[in-house]
């Protein structure tokens, strides 16, 4: 996923279907400098991770 699209998803009031390794996730924050995003699985909000944007897929 590119940085611009990830930022659009974060700012959107609508929930978008995004996955990381096949797991549905929520994007909390996009770091443009490092090309990463802070995410968590929808069913485990306490499990935050910092991942590369190119590993995220929009369904």
From Swiss-Prot:
Family statement: Belongs to the SspH family.
HAMAP family, sorted: SspH
InterPro entries registered for this protein in UniProt: SASP_SspH (IPR012610)
Subcellular location: Spore core
Induction of its expression: Expressed only in the forespore compartment of sporulating cells. Disappears after 45 minutes of spore germination. Expression is sigma G-dependent.
A GO biological process held by the record: asexual sporulation
Record-given protein name: Small, acid-soluble spore protein H
Gene Ontology CC: endospore-forming forespore
Domain of life: Bacteria
Keywords linked to the UniProt accession: Sporulation
Species for this entry: Bacillus subtilis (strain 168)
């Amino acid at each position: 996923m590119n940085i611009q699209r990830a930022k659009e998803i974060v700012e959107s009031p609508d929930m978008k279907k995004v996955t990381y390794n096949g797991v549905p996730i929520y994007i909390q924050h996009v770091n443009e400098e490092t090309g990463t995003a802070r995410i968590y699985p929808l069913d485990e909000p306490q499990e935050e991770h910092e991942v590369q944007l190119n590993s995220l897929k929009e369904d």
